[in-house]
Every structure is written in structure tokens, then in C-alpha cells.
């Protein structure tokens, strides 16, 4: 198993990163990708990845919430991080019109700039989209032929949105959202429609703790060690063997991110 989305730079992990990594290994994970969401956290993600070679890797980018910080120097500041072998994707980047912590115009400018950077450097993109599907697709589509790959992380969209993403060749990241018996039911119904070769699994830790995990953790903090539960639930709803799905999704991640 490989967790493609862990926010290990989040303050909730500030006191026990070694223990979190150890628990992930004990749970059977073979790696995790640490998400970068701004320049500072991307540098921190790279530092953490370098501390755990061949188990942790990083992304580097600017999340749409932080797009208001993007300026004429941002691409040049980001590029050295992206050229590190431990950084395997550009992102988290994309559009989030649900909250608009940055204006849509700021988000679109930062997104397009990062797509250009990914094309220039030759690394895949780690994507975010919330309530912005039409613009997201419109901005992304022209770049796809110049990118080595793309994953829409933490997918929670509709069947039409899923089909549109799959038609463009995107990988689909699925989280513990499928373990929420209230909000996750529509996503559960879509699981069988994601081809196995396009499916990736992630915790998005410390967020999105699977609601149905037993025994319930003392903390609401999600961790990579809970990825096996997500994989088993995904396999259940897809009516597939869990061990097979764990291996297939790891293979997918290694192919997309070009991991050894």
C-alpha cells in the first residue's frame, strides 16, 4: 500500500512524526507522499521526505487557498524544490470555489502557472478541485498532453465529473470519505466505476478520519496507518479482493509518481 496524500507538515503531527511513520510501516504501508500546500510547507515536506528515503516522498506547490500569495517570484522559488528527486509531483494545486480564501482569478493564475511549471520540469500534478469542475477542466485540458500524469486527489464529485476526469486520463484519489455512512454514500456508489488501473488511495491525514473505524481512536486525528481500513472498505464496495486492490493501487502510485 502507498498513501498518496499525507499532510505530515500539519501541526497536529509536530510532536510525533517518527511514531506516525513507524505505525504506517507496521500497518503494512510501503510508502507515503507528503503533501506540500505552500512554499514553506513544501520545503518542510521535502525535508521530511529526505529524512525517510525510499519510504516518504513529497509534492511541492501552492494550494488554491494560498493562491493569493502567488506572485511573480513564486515559480522561481518553487522550481528548486521541484527539481529535487524526492519531490515527485507539482501540487497541491487547482481550484476551490467552495470557500474562496483566494479569489477565483488568483486561484486560476496560480493553477495555470503551476501547470506550466509541471510541463517545464516534467513532473505529474497533484490536483485539488472543489465546486469548480468546469473551470478546472477548462484550464487543465490544454496542458495534459505536456504532462507526464495527473491525479485528482480526494475526489468527492459526481458521476459526470468522474467520467470527465477519467476521459482525460486522470488518476482518482479516494479517501476515508467512503467510510462516512452519511456523507460518503454517493462516493461509495461511484467506486465500481473507477477502473482499477486509475485508482489511488490516500488518507489525507490528519483530516478525514474514517468514521466507521473500530475501535474508535482516542483522537480525531487521522493517520497513514488507517489506510488499510480505507483499502478494505474500497475493495468491499468494489467487490474485489482487498489484498489485490492494495497491490494494484500501490503499483498505480509507483507508475504515476515514478517511484523505485
Curated annotation (Swiss-Prot):
Keyword set includes Nuclease: yes
EC numbers, comma separated: 3.1.11.-, 3.1.13.-
A GO-annotated cellular component: cytoplasm
Hydrolase among keywords: yes
Annotated function: 3'-5' exonuclease that prefers single-stranded DNA and RNA. May play a role in the H(2)O(2)-induced DNA damage repair.
Oligomeric and partner information: Monomer.
Protein name, entry field: 3'-5' ssDNA/RNA exonuclease TatD
Organism the protein comes from: Edwardsiella piscicida
Classification of source organism: Bacteria, Pseudomonadati, Pseudomonadota, Gammaproteobacteria, Enterobacterales
Gene: tatD
